[in-house]
Amino acid sequence: MSGPPSHEIGMLYSLAPSVDMKSENIEDLPSESIPTTNHCASNYFYAPECPDIGHLRALSIMNRWTETEFVISDDLRDVSMLTEEERYFYRFLFTFLSAADDLVNLNIDNLLGLFSQKDIHHYYFEQECIEAVHSRAYSIIQLMLFDNDSLARAEYVKTSLNSPAIQSKLDWLNKRVIECSSIAEKYILMILIEGIFFSASFAAIAYLRINNLFVVTCQINNLISRDEAIHVEASCCIFKNYLMGPKPSIGRVQELFKEAVQIECAFLRTAAPRNSQLLDVEAICSYVRYSADRLLKELDMPPIYNEPKPTADFPLALMTASNNTNFFERRNTAYSGSVSNDL
């Protein structure tokens, strides 16, 4: 598959600058980015330091899954049931999610240099592992939507990554990364990528399940969205409790959230099929605003929109962490534990 343009990879890498520990001018590095290197005995064995992050790592481990557990060919019959516009829309969503997920995974290595705590390192190792599963799952789903024509998929990806809807997200991130005054502000941008810029896509895919379409794809979407809920909760926890140095003001964080929500809703409205009965665009935009308020509360900041919780018939409400299984699902994808910020 043709990869995203190199400037996009550079943009996401710049979200968490790596630290060159070989630098002779260590005093020139920002103090907030210099990890602790004390040569004490605890450097050479594991000792719990971050119980909250340790809990999220353990939750992620309990709920490991792989793409090989699912038979995506069961969904092939449903491809022909989509209109041409609907098929284009879902191809577009999975192209975006696949590219963004891969780039987030590339960026995790750079995050490790910001922290000395082994609990945080171990958590990020676990996140890298499951993000790789997401990447492989997205690739399988993409091929299904292109009738297993890998050349057609590659050509489409090459073109769609330059679409205005995706470029608006990348351009905004580029601009904001350049303007960032601290690593903490860049960390907020990472929270927005996984917490806001994925949310409309997850919801739009979930609408397929209430129409008994793409059952296996929806099961995978279920698991990926729950994994990302853990990742975002961990990012909020690390930002609040373990990221040293100056942090952006509440006003600045709210400004970034407002802009991200506007871009995500515009992304959906631009790409969504106009005459489809499958999804409710305005309900999804309401969910995006609700997600923003929820994340701000997770960061101990006041909400912006005071958006109500989605109603019970909103499809992502089926993706709770409790042991519930949709009537149409043939494999139970209930999580072993609970995610505190889930619906």
From Swiss-Prot:
Fe cation 1 binds at residues 101, 131, 134. InterPro entries: Ferritin-like_SF, HSV_RIR2, RNR-like, RNR_small, RNR_small_AS, RNR_small_fam. It is a single-pass membrane protein. Gene3D superfamilies: Ribonucleotide Reductase, subunit A. The active site is at 138. SUPFAM superfamilies: Ferritin-like (SSF47240). GO terms for biological process: deoxyribonucleotide biosynthetic process; DNA replication. PROSITE patterns: RIBORED_SMALL. Keywords: DNA replication, Host membrane, Iron, Membrane, Metal-binding, Oxidoreductase, Transmembrane, Transmembrane helix. The keyword Metal-binding applies. One of its GO terms (cellular component) is host cell membrane. Ribonucleoside-diphosphate reductase holoenzyme provides the precursors necessary for viral DNA synthesis. Allows virus growth in non-dividing cells, as well as reactivation from latency in infected hosts. Catalyzes the biosynthesis of deoxyribonucleotides from the corresponding ribonucleotides. HAMAP family: HSV_RIR2. Heterotetramer composed of a homodimer of the large subunit (R1) and a homodimer of the small subunit (R2). Larger multisubunit protein complex are also active, composed of (R1)n(R2)n. This is Ribonucleoside-diphosphate reductase small subunit. It comes from Gallid herpesvirus 2 (strain Chicken/Md5/ATCC VR-987) (GaHV-2).
